[in-house]
């Protein structure tokens, strides 16, 4: 299985600027790299406002052209979706396209497509102290793997593994779809309701924006509270942290507890002595609440492996556009070596 796709014509140059696009289930963020890791002209567009990726890219390129900027010939896109061939269909939206056809339609020499959390993993080395908040103490081992997990529209999972001779390889996978194991009574309520309506309950079903709505609906039904229309994720978080609504607070408690448990599972699988990084669009807004929650207790509640996990530092990524440096790295590697460093 391929972990990235690079559609290209015979390149006649590898010059800047280069186009970067981080495509989530809700938003697509475009940027222009004008020199190595010099990234600017960031624009966020709603996925739902454009019929296709090509249309959204044209919208951004038209704005560049109108400003007099030089148009890029090389591009990299991160997708909230597995990338296993030329044809891509987003998991949490209806965009579907051919990478090669999109490259040709836009007149690009190169178009690299990778998973969005793989690009975020590639970008971890470029995060500075101001881009992170440490929520668990620990001592990171520089030569060890780093784990990455993050809830947003879906649940992204990746990691960064040091490679022999220097550098690192980002892992491409779909770890957000692993089985979910509830522990507390409220978690079981949410799990049973989700199982009844959807069948198999993956981690993403509850650890995502849609998961917040699902958890709240399940707790509401259990308590006999009438909810005519399911709350949106934004309504749940506002209810918990601005209005102190009891059901919304219970929803967030379930969410943070499950996240601690799943993050620890990912760390154990990866041997993430280099640390655990929490990304995605939800957590950066609620770092104090996450720190005050059961997350840390659940992270180490793994029986005989408690001592192992207790050594691992955990960080929340708070940078505004943390995946863009990883996309720049993937594109540079492709232009220099034919493919990004992805395993």
Curated annotation (Swiss-Prot):
Is Coiled coil among this UniProt entry's keywords?
no
Q: Name one Pfam family in it.
A: Glucokinase
Q: EC no.? A: 2.7.1.2
InterPro entries given for it? ATPase_NBD, Bacterial_glucokinase, Glucokinase
Q: What is the enzyme's main class? A: transferase
Keyword check for Cytoplasm, yes or no.
Answer: yes
What subcellular compartments does it reside in? Cytoplasm
A single GO cellular-component term on record: cytosol
GO terms assigned for molecular function:
ATP binding; D-glucose binding; glucokinase activity
Alphabetical GO biological process terms = glycolytic process
* Reactions this protein catalyses: D-glucose + ATP = D-glucose 6-phosphate + ADP + H(+)
Q: Which residues bind ATP?
A: 21-26
Give the UniProt family note.
Belongs to the bacterial glucokinase family.
Q: What keywords are annotated for this sequence in UniProt? A: ATP-binding, Cytoplasm, Glycolysis, Kinase, Nucleotide-binding, Transferase
This protein is called Glucokinase
């Amino acid at each position: 299985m391929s972990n990235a796709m690079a559609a290209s014509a015979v390149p006649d140059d590898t010059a800047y600027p280069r186009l970067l696009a981080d495509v989530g289930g809700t938003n697509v963020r475009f940027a222009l790299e004008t020199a190595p890791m010099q990234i600017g002209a960031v624009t966020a567009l709603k996925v739902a406002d454009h019929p296709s990726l090509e249309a959204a890219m044209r919208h951004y390129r038209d704005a560049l052209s109108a400003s007099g900027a030089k148009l890029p010939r090389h591009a990299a896109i991160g997708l909230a979706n597995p990338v296993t061939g030329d044809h891509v269909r987003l998991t949490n939206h209806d965009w579907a396209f051919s990478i090669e056809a999109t490259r040709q339609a836009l007149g690009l020499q190169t178009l690299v497509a990778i998973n969005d959390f793989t690009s975020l993993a590639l970008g971890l080395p470029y995060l500075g102290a101001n881009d992170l908040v440490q929520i668990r103490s620990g001592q990171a081992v520089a030569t060890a793997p780093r784990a990455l997990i993050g809830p947003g529209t879906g649940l992204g999972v990746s990691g960064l593994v040091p490679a022999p001779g220097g550098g690192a390889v980002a892992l491409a996978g779909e770890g957000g779809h692993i089985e979910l194991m509830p522990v507390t009574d409220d978690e079981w309520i949410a799990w049973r309701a989700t199982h009844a309506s959807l069948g198999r309950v993956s981690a993403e079903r509850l650890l995502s924006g849609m998961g917040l709505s699902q958890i709240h609906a399940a707790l509401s039904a259990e308590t006999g509270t009438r909810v005519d229309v399911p709350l949106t994720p934004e309504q749940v978080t506002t209810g918990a942290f601005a209005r102190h609504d009891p059901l919304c607070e219970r929803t967030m408690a379930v969410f943070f507890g499950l996240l601690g448990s799943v993050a620890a599972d990912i760390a154990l699988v990866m041997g993430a002595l280099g640390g655990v990084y929490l990304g995605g669009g939800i957590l950066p807004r609620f770092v104090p609440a996450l720190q005050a929650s059961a997350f840390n207790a659940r992270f180490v509640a793994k029986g005989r492996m408690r001592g192992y996990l207790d050594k691992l530092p955990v960080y929340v990524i708070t940078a505004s556009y943390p995946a863009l440096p990883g996309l720049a790295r993937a594109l540079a590697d492709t232009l220099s070596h034919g493919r990004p460093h992805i395993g």
